Amino acid sequence: MEQEARVLRAAGGFGRARRLLASASWVPCIVLGLVLSSEELLTAQPAPHCRPDPTLLPPALRALRGPALLDAAIPRLGPTRAPAEALGVLSPSYLAPLTRAPRPSSWASCSGAAAGPTWNLVCGDGWKVPLEQVSHLLGWLLGCVILGAGCDRFGRRAVFVASLVLTTGLGASEALAASFPTLLVLRLLHGGTLAGALLALYLARLELCDPPHRLAFSMGAGLFSVVGTLLLPGLAALVQDWRLLQGLGALMSGLLLLFWGFPALFPESPCWLLATGQVARARKILWRFAEASGVGPGDSSLEENSLATELTMLSARSPQPRYHSPLGLLRTRVTWRNGLILGFSSLVGGGIRASFRRSLAPQVPTFYLPYFLEAGLEAAALVFLLLTADCCGRRPVLLLGTMVTGLASLLLLAGAQYLPGWTVLFLSVLGLLASRAVSALSSLFAAEVFPTVIRGAGLGLVLGAGFLGQAAGPLDTLHGRQGFFLQQVVFASLAVLALLCVLLLPESRSRGLPQSLQDADRLRRSPLLRGRPRQDHLPLLPPSNSYWAGHTPEQH
């Protein structure tokens, strides 16, 4: 690890070229955040309404139209035969002459102007919405795991470019889907390719930065992703059709490929090239970094050798590329445990949000207010991490976020029926904020403790665990929300367990990225609270007079 670090310092360190490339990597996050957030808008359920169904009325009343049909269809309740409310959800015993209107959701056009068929996603077909959500999240999970391992074998740039090509094609295909099963498969594949692009971009950015700037550039990328989330409703209001919105997302992915497909804007990670022994490819990139930073490849100082000398030494040590299987993680002593703990905390942070959203729903029943609230909470969580994770350390902040998440969940679980509305709202918002912080910090923490040779696979497993947790909400909806209370109990208990596991993690703040499996195993757990420096022990007995007679105070 020391030799690779010397090579990067000889190439100018975190100089002008690397700063510009790391900053330019923020721009694709806007598009990726917009496309990722489109899932919530595409699957938004319309408000329930009822309409008369003439086929359920007696034959003599089927010819009625307008107010007369509505008056005949509305059930009469009680001894006074008062008409029931026509809007809203009616109880099954009074639903005989009425059916819920298939009001258009995000996948159906009210005017029928959309190209191709539309699908009814309410009433008896409401199961299609959570099924699509589960399919899309499953695609993200598989993409993180499979393409994360691909990043370690083929490189960050190769996976990023290939994922953007597939994302553009699949996004355009979704806009032309002719059946719901086709759309389901396309959404699964689309989620996987988006995960690959996001993961490769995250790894390349992190490996460009030096330890003091890793947190700032990672959180900055998250804030740009929030910008894409905030832009999505405006674009949806502009195009007024979900197919056009999907086509617009594919167009923006194509523009990303047009610009970031060039090596000048997205070069291969020199950190990965050096760790896998591809010194010849790393030499070209590092020389370009050195020239852009004003450092000559042959320049050297008294403390360090020149870039050319360091690269020559690396070439002699590793003449052939060396790739590592993700299964090598099982042969480590400490790294597998760190990955397991961070994956567990990511699972809890992603899965527990459903309970907070459920508690938040009665307080803010509209769609746009919770949407913008969650986007604002994600931005607030990133700013909180930016301010605290460097000065306090990764592990204490993750411990605090996990503790707040578990405490808010337990309070809502125990007293939601007895607490006032403003308290439930406050706990829900606090829990969402803390869970967002836990998810973001778990990803950064995992990227810092996994070695470069398997960092893609390790981070992919941690991110995939978070998407697996998020799939718990749609799965419960698919079963009619019958197990929501049990799900809330399970995730609240897991949050308490994660609180204990976080104590076993090492501290990665201000440390260089480990390159090999041996480097990652050297990251050991440090004390959580730093005490005062230990003082010199004073002698139990005062020195004798003969001691003072033979020594002056200065000599003592």
UniProtKB/Swiss-Prot annotation:
Intracellular or extracellular location(s): Membrane
Q: How does it sit in the membrane?
A: Multi-pass membrane protein
Q: Pfam families, from UniProt? A: Sugar_tr (PF00083)
Write one Gene Ontology MF term. Answer: transmembrane transporter activity
Give the source's domain of life in one word.
Eukaryota
Q: So where does this one cross the membrane?
A: 24-44, 129-149, 158-178, 183-203, 219-239, 247-267, 340-357, 367-387, 396-416, 421-441, 449-469, 484-504
User: Hey, which stretches end up on the Extracellular side?
Assistant: 45-128, 179-182, 240-246, 358-366, 417-420, 470-483
List, in alphabetical order, the GO biological process terms annotated in this UniProt record.
monoatomic ion transport
Is the Transmembrane helix keyword given for this protein? yes
Residue ranges of the region described as Disordered: 524-556
Output the Gene Ontology cellular-component terms.
membrane
- Per the record, what ranges lie on the membrane's Cytoplasmic side? 1-23, 150-157, 204-218, 268-339, 388-395, 442-448, 505-556
Which keywords, in A-to-Z order, does the entry hold? Ion transport, Membrane, Transmembrane, Transmembrane helix, Transport
| Disulphide bridges, residue numbers | none
Q: Which family does it belong to?
A: Belongs to the major facilitator (TC 2.A.1) superfamily. Organic cation transporter (TC 2.A.1.19) family.
Function of this protein?
Organic anion transporter that mediates the uptake of ions.
Protein name (Swiss-Prot/TrEMBL): Putative solute carrier family 22 member 31
Gene encoding this chain?
A: SLC22A31
